[in-house]
Amino acid sequence: MRANNNNTREEERSSSSKQQQPQAHMSLKIIDSCLRLSVVPLSVATIWLTVTNHESNPDYGNLDYNSIMGLKYMVGVSAISAIYALLSTISLWVTCLVSKAWLFFVPDQVLAYVMTTSVAGATEIVYLLNKGDKIVTWSEMCSSYPHYCSKLTIALGLHVFVLFFFLFLSVISAYRAFSPFDPPCDSQTNIDA
């Protein structure tokens, strides 16, 4: 009798967890889609702020997007991330592609790492523009180009948000890719059994 009650309880738990599983997957899919869609306007704004950013100074000349190579890298990474985010959002709702979790996992991981390098490079550029580097005789430029520096700082802030979104997306896609597999067995448990 007692074994029968335990079996009934286990069946109830397993049936309720099976009912909750599609709801959890749907809410995860919605969060994933929202994050991916949020990347697009932030990346486009980063590109626009960086490319249209220019300022002239009568003493030092013109400073624009083409003057600093690291900004071209940031713009390129932003463009790639915006295009990928849009395409992956569309693909997320195509049933035959959703079952292929690796199609999302690998690019999400790669873009998270590439975004990290881009943010690091852009942060260094903004730091050098603000503080300079006396050892290599690079003077700070933000006192001469204040509008340029403030616009670039805003672009960097947006780029950092995109990085955080991609880091979170890489965790979600890793969960999707690896959740079908069983956890590794504990050798201590196997010995006791």
From Swiss-Prot:
Keyword hit for Protein biosynthesis: no
Stretches of the chain found on the membrane's Cytoplasmic side: 1-29, 95-109, 173-193
Cellular compartments per GO CC: plasma membrane
Extracellular side: 51-73, 133-151
Transmembrane segments annotated in the record for this chain: 30-50, 74-94, 110-132, 152-172
UniProt keyword terms in alphabetical order: Cell membrane, Membrane, Transmembrane, Transmembrane helix
InterPro entries per UniProt: CASP/CASPL, CASP_dom
Extent of the signal sequence: none
Residues covered by region (Disordered): 1-24
Places the protein is found: Cell membrane
Major location category of this protein: membrane
KW Methyltransferase (keyword) present: no
Topology within the bilayer: Multi-pass membrane protein
Subunit comment: Homodimer and heterodimers.
Family assignment from sequence similarity: Belongs to the Casparian strip membrane proteins (CASP) family.
Name by which UniProt lists this protein: CASP-like protein 2D1
Source species of the chain: Arabidopsis lyrata subsp. lyrata
